Structures are given as structure tokens and as C-alpha cells.
Amino acid sequence: MIFPIFFTFFLLLSSSHASVQDFCVADYKAPDGPAGYSCKKPAKVTINDFVYSGLGIAGNTTNIIKAAVTPAFAAQFPGVNGLGISLARLDLGPGGVIPFHTHPGASEVLLVVQGTIIAGFVASDNTPYLKTLKKGDIMVFPQGLLHFQVNGGGTPALAFPSFSSPSPGLQILDFALFKNDLPTELIAQTTFLDAAQIKKLKGVLGGTN
């Protein structure tokens, strides 16, 4: 009898801030912190804080990766602050690609609604998992693992990724390596890539040295 009572008490103590209150709409006038935005005063909350219309507009895919991500994270959608969820729109033009990247703060579920997308991730033991996804398919990407999406057809593809955090974070591997001022010689030593290729990639992505 004691254990169930203790367990219930523990669950109550470990409840999130959002479960103590009905919601915690982001207050953009206050600074953002590791735990998210401060809560807007309830008297200033409106229905518009819980509605976001930006995902109905196609992203601009006329760029080097032929892709666009339109986020509805806490920074854009105040109503998701503190709720442990968020959403985005992914547009992939023909030949479009989202390079290897990670979300340090969230797992991801990808729903394909148009076209064909080749998606995959690499586990911590370096085992790759990949699948060609079509309309109606969903795929999960565990938190923190490197993953990618590639347009697998000759027509535009559209998907909606959702996340287990209002601020999932993002680090793109190619940008981390080549869109910076790390010395080419150091990158060559740590990646076993040819210096000429590294300089070429730095030139394409905006890196120096």
C-alpha cells in the first residue's frame, strides 16, 4: 500500500509546468531560456495564441538544397510553449534534400502528404535505417540521432514533421563541418577528407580558412 501512495506522490511532484497550469503561452517580451519562454499573463492570452496559419504556405525551394522548412515552434507559435509539442512544414523540390542533421531536444515523426521521400537515420551503433516513404506514410526519428530526407521522385514532395518539444533544436552536419572558420587542415585530420574537397565545400556553404 505504501508503494502506490509514494509513486502517486512522486508523479505529482514531477509534473511539468504546463500540467500545473492549463497552458503557458509564450511571452515574447520576456527573454527565452533553457526551459522555454516565460508565461504570458492569462489576462493577455487570446485565441490567436493557439492558432498558427503559416503552414499553409509553400516554402521557397530555390536554394542549394532545393528544400524549405517552415517551423511552428515556440518562437513562431506561442501556444505550444510548455506543451512538449511542435510542428513544421517540409517542402522538397525535385532533387531536394535535407542533409544529415540532428534535433538535440526532440524526437521527430514525419508524415508524408505528397510525393516520395527517402528518409533514414543512423543509430548510435552506426546501423543505418532507411525507407522510401509515400503519401500517408509516417516515420519516427529518435531524439539526437543523425537523420535525413531526400526527394525520391521527379515532382515536389510535401511532409509535416512533428516534434516532442516546442523547441527541438537543429544542427546540420554539413554546416557544422564546412560553414565555419575551422582550419581546413584540422577538418582534414578529423574527417579523413581531402583538403581540396573541404575548401570546395567551405566555398559552397560559406565557410572560411
Swiss-Prot record:
**Binding positions for Mn(2+) per the UniProt entry:** H101, H103, E108, H147
Q: Gene3D superfamilies this protein is in?
A: Jelly Rolls
What keywords are assigned to this protein?
Apoplast, Auxin signaling pathway, Cell wall, Disulfide bond, Glycoprotein, Manganese, Metal-binding, Receptor, Secreted, Signal
Q: Which residues are glycosylated?
A: N60
- Domain Cupin type-1, first and last residues per copy: 53-199
Which BP terms from GO are recorded?
auxin-activated signaling pathway
Q: Does the keyword Transcription regulation apply?
A: no
Q: What InterPro entries does the annotation carry?
A: Cupin_1, Germin, Germin_Mn-BS, RmlC-like_jellyroll, RmlC_Cupin_sf
Q: Where does it reside?
A: Secreted, Extracellular space, Apoplast; Secreted, Cell wall
| Pfam families associated with the record | Cupin_1
Signal sequence residues: 1-18
UniProt record similarity statement: Belongs to the germin family.
- Subunit description: Interacts with ABP20.
Name of the molecule in the record: Auxin-binding protein ABP19a
Q: Which organism is it from?
A: Prunus persica (Peach)
